[in-house]
């Protein structure tokens, strides 16, 4: 047996976070247990869990402090409420049948325990660590989470300590608000008026980037830290270099022109995927985007069917969305140029995943009101809007 469990519980400085391994005495967990007892580390000295002095639980459990213990006051929080909490959680797990009595002499547990140096309330330290340990044991022996849960939740979750959400594009359709006005104060003001939504993307347009460079991404994050930000570079050369520049600036996606050499597009997509950002291929003035897709080694994450500002009076060019998705079923299709409220049903009906809207929102007299109208037209609820959530 070799099972892994994790749980976080509580709040404030007394918050408990427990990582643990459960396994056979003769296996890797048993070896880790023995090593922990015999190879001590300054500030992270392992200790046996005990319900009270002279009463350890079964299976035997080794506690390892995650945070360096620097003085006896901090040591008392481990050698006390945390030590007892972990032990009682193990004993209760046996009593409740989570751990079989037949296994208690065959397996051991190694638990890493987080105690913040500022934690003061021993009652909370005990209760939070008891709950976290018990939950971690149950999860470990129950195989939680399964891979389907991981994949479903990975794009929804915000790490409690990190404090902000990294947005990914997994639940279309989306509204992408494009800012071409090269005035950062105007852009920041307009972004602050756009309603917060799981289905809004912010685009740093080409003129904006030409004026301010990659630093404009940080300026946008000052207003909307968790925004999904597209850097519309319309790359034509040095694709890998420009993709790395966007990634280093904490952008989420880079736009490459479909007019670029195939080798440039390939290098940009490869570098984007290497650095964890999205690659968007813009078809502005490219008469045959399908042929470009067929020549690529790796598909972009998004293809943008784009009608330029200077030619927006002509009919839209969204008719080949179905053909694109036959070639690349997982690709997201964005439509840009001439997207008005009355055109939203048409675009969505033809299979568009992202609606790119610029001046219709950014130059309107009431940015918030118009943006809300576009968001509502997507007919898409917020992710987990009706979910009452503790941990799951």
Curated annotation (Swiss-Prot):
Q: Which GO terms describe its biological process?
A: 'de novo' pyrimidine nucleobase biosynthetic process; carbohydrate biosynthetic process; L-ascorbic acid catabolic process
| Pathway assigned in UniProt | Carbohydrate biosynthesis; D-ribose 5-phosphate biosynthesis
Q: Which domain of life is it from?
A: Archaea
Q: Which reaction does it catalyse?
A: 5,6,7,8-tetrahydromethanopterin + formaldehyde = 5,10-methylenetetrahydromethanopterin + H2O; D-ribulose 5-phosphate + formaldehyde = D-arabino-hex-3-ulose 6-phosphate
Q: Which residues form the active site?
A: 17 (proton donor)
Gene3D superfamilies linked to this entry? Aldolase class I (3.20.20.70), Formaldehyde-activating enzyme (3.30.230.60)
Q: What protein name is recorded for this chain?
A: Bifunctional enzyme Fae/Hps
Q: Which organism is it from?
A: Methanosarcina barkeri (strain Fusaro / DSM 804)
């Amino acid at each position: 047996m070799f099972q892994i469990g994790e749980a976080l519980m509580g709040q404030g400085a007394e918050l408990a976070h427990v990582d643990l391994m459960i396994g056979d005495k003769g296996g890797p967990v048993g070896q880790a247990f023995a090593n922990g007892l015999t190879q001590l580390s300054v500030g992270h000295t392992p200790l046996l869990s005990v319900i009270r002095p002279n009463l350890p639980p079964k299976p035997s459990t080794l506690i390892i402090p995650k945070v360096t213990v620097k003085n006896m006051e901090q040591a008392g929080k481990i050698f006390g409420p945390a030590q007892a909490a972990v032990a009682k959680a193990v004993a209760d797990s046996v009593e409740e049948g989570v751990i079989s009595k037949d296994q208690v002499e065959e397996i051991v547990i190694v638990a890493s325990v987080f105690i913040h140096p500022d934690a003061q309330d021993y009652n909370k330290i005990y209760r939070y660590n008891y709950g976290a340990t018990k939950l971690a044991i149950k999860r470990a022996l129950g195989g939680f989470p399964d891979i389907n849960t991981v994949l479903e939740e990975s794009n929804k979750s915000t790490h409690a300590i990190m404090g902000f959400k990294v947005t990914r594009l997994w639940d279309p359709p989306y509204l992408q608000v494009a800012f071409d006005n090269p005035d950062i104060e105007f852009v920041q003001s307009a972004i602050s008026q756009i309603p917060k939504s799981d289905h809004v993307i912010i685009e740093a347009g080409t003129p904006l980037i030409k004026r301010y460079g990659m630093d404009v991404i940080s300026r946008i994050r000052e207003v909307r830290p968790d925004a999904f930000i597209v850097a519309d570079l319309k790359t034509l050369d040095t694709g890998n270099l420009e993709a790395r520049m966007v990634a280093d600036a904490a952008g989420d996606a880079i736009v490459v022109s479909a007019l670029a050499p195939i080798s440039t597009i390939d290098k940009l997509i490869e570098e984007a995927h290497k650095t964890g950002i999205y690659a968007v291929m813009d078809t502005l003035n490219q008469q045959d985007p399908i042929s470009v897709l067929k020549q690529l080694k790796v598909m972009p994450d998004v293809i943008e069917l784009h009608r330029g500002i200077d030619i927006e009076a002509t009919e839209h060019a969204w008719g080949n969305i179905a053909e694109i998705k036959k070639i690349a079923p997982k690709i997201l299709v964005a439509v840009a140029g001439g997207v008005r409220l009355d055109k939203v049903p048409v675009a969505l009906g033809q299979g568009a995943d992202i609606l790119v809207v610029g001046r219709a929102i950014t130059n309107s007299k009431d940015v918030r009101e118009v943006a809300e109208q576009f968001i509502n037209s997507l007919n898409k609820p917020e992710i987990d809007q009706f979910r009452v959530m503790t941990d799951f």
